[in-house]
UniProtKB/Swiss-Prot annotation:
Belongs to the anthrone oxygenase family. It is a multi-pass membrane protein. One of its GO terms (cellular component) is membrane. Keywords: Membrane, Monooxygenase, Oxidoreductase, Transmembrane, Transmembrane helix. Pathway: Secondary metabolite biosynthesis. Secalonic acids show unprecedented anticancer activities against various human cancer cells and might be interesting for further derivatization, targeting diseases such as cancer. The gene is AacuG. It is found in: Membrane. This is Anthrone oxygenase AacuG. It catalyses: emodin anthrone + O2 = emodin + H2O + H(+). The chain crosses the membrane at residues 27-47, 67-87. Its EC number is 1.10.3.-.
């Protein structure tokens, strides 16, 4: 027979270590960093390295292509994580509008 203090601990359900609030903020931060790096780093480098219009157009189109592949899916994932965090929080309390407001501010 197990010790009386161990039995309640064994009956407790183990909580998941996944925190949707942290995941939403992290993916939003990564997305914001990626967009800022494109604006503040990649575009000036493109303009400094070449002035030949066809080559500049080719580099810009490749940069747009890579951003088009990655960034929209990251934005959708971030939005879904904010919604999931709001739903999880709403199940525990009634202040889920703060997370939805955070998602709305991040998308605008």
């Amino acid at each position: 027979m197990p010790h009386p203090m161990v039995a309640p601990a064994l009956r407790r359900r183990r909580r998941s270590s996944f925190n949707p609030h942290v995941a939403a903020v992290m993916t939003g931060s990564i997305l914001a960093g990626a967009m800022l790096s494109l604006s503040f780093i990649a575009v000036p480098v493109l303009l400094d390295t070449t002035t030949h219009p066809p080559q500049l157009f080719h580099k810009w189109s490749r940069l747009y292509h890579y951003g088009h592949v990655v960034l929209p899916s990251t934005a959708i994932l971030t939005g879904l994580l904010y919604i999931y965090a709001a739903v999880c929080h709403h199940q525990r309390s009634s202040r889920s509008s703060l997370y939805l407001a955070g998602y709305g501010a991040q998308q605008s």
